């Protein structure tokens, strides 16, 4: 296959595993569940899940049933939990492939039980409690009692119960404490005891490391991919994360322009003096959005500002006369001795690292390496 375009998203599998192990070691009594939803935040779930699996990880989470089924081929004997709500008509696929599902309500469980009567085997579920996120799950104690009664069914394997902190990356613990109290109150409703109890996401995993509680699993997401959920979590200084993803390219064209010359769509940039302009083959069709205009990327060892509007397939930067065709370009991550924080790249665009990763689409090849060697 021809791979003419030099733009790549490089993924360091060693750093990924190191981050997982560091985060998992913060909570020695708990299992670290690797969140590989949304194609591992855009970095490539098949390769990442397989690498983690080969290194002993046996608990994973996806957002959809389709994602879970796709991964089962490489992590067959692992627990894979679907965090989103699936159509109850499709529970048979979860049973057939040993996939665990989120139970968001009594109605969903009742509907699922109807479909389960038509197939062999048990459905593994994790009951979702809404403790304050307001997204899915229930907080009604009477409804929880009814769910507990339905767990008597021989068609259900009550594998887990969980919730989700909505502000664990914030400065104070007030809302976390509120959610924890709601969680504990709801847990007392259940006469059936699950195998797993979990509420901590990446932020909670770091913030509440080695907390004395009854929870036995943490969900490790964005932090595994080398990003702190927030500056507040980074300031705790409990774990040193390693960058995992680097967006790189090369200069394809360099030209000199005269003072007063305009360039780009909408002629949004005008040279104040004679300048050199380098073109890089990446644009918003690749997921590098127009709001990146003005950000300073690395071209070789230089800081070069993105000038003019980001185009669909290319962008331009103002550079020195020393820049040449073929010079390395770094948008975020680590490459060729240069380093740019993805958080810095995201903050400039008024967003978060999660979105930056997820926006980089399939036209940009993912290149994986470990032991400093490309796979």
List each language-model region with its residue ranges.
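Active-site anion/phosphate-binding pocket segments in diverse small-molecule metabolic enzymes
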Residues: 2-12, 17, 67, 86-88, ...
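Active-site-proximal beta-alpha core segment in soluble small-molecule metabolic enzymes
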Residues: 2-3, 7-11, 15-18, 25-189, ...
């Amino acid at each position: 296959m021809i791979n003419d375009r030099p733009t790549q998203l490089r993924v360091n599998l060693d750093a990924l595993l190191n981050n997982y192990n560091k985060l998992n070691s913060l909570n020695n009594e708990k299992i670290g569940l690797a969140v590989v939803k949304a194609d591992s935040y855009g970095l490539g779930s098949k390769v990442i899940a397989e690498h983690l699996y080969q290194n002993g990880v046996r608990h994973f989470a996806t957002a959809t049933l389709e994602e879970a089924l796709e991964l089962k081929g490489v992590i067959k004997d692992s627990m894979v939990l679907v965090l989103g709500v699936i159509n109850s008509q499709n529970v048979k696929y979860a049973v057939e492939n040993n996939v665990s599902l989120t139970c968001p309500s009594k109605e969903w469980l009742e509907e699922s039980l109807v479909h389960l009567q038509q197939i062999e085997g048990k459905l593994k579920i994790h009951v979702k409690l809404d403790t304050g996120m307001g997204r899915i799950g229930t907080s009604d104690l009477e409804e929880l009692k009814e769910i507990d009664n339905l767990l008597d069914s021989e068609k259900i394997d009550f594998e887990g119960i969980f919730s989700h902190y909505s502000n664990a990356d914030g400065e104070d613990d007030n809302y976390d404490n509120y959610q924890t109290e709601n969680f504990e109150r709801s847990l007392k409703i259940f006469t059936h005891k699950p195998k797993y109890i979990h509420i901590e996401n990446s932020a909670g995993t770091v913030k509440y490391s080695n907390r004395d509680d009854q929870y036995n699993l943490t969900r490790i997401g964005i932090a595994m991919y080398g990003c702190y959920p927030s500056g507040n979590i980074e300031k705790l200084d409990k774990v040193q994360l390693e960058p995992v993803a680097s967006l790189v390219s090369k200069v394809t064209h360099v030209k000199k322009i005269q003072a007063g010359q305009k360039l780009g769509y909408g002629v949004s940039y005008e040279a104040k003096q004679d300048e050199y302009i380098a073109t890089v083959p990446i644009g918003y069709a690749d997921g590098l959005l127009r709001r990146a205009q003005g950000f300073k990327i690395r071209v070789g060892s230089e800081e070069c500002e993105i000038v003019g509007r980001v185009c669909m397939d290319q962008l331009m930067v103002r550079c020195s006369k020393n820049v040449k065709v073929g010079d390395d370009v770094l948008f975020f991550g680590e490459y060729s001795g240069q380093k740019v924080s993805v958080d810095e790249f995201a903050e400039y665009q008024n967003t978060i690292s999660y979105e930056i990763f997820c926006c980089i689409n399939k036209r940009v090849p993912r290149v994986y390496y470990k032991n400093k060697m490309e796979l």
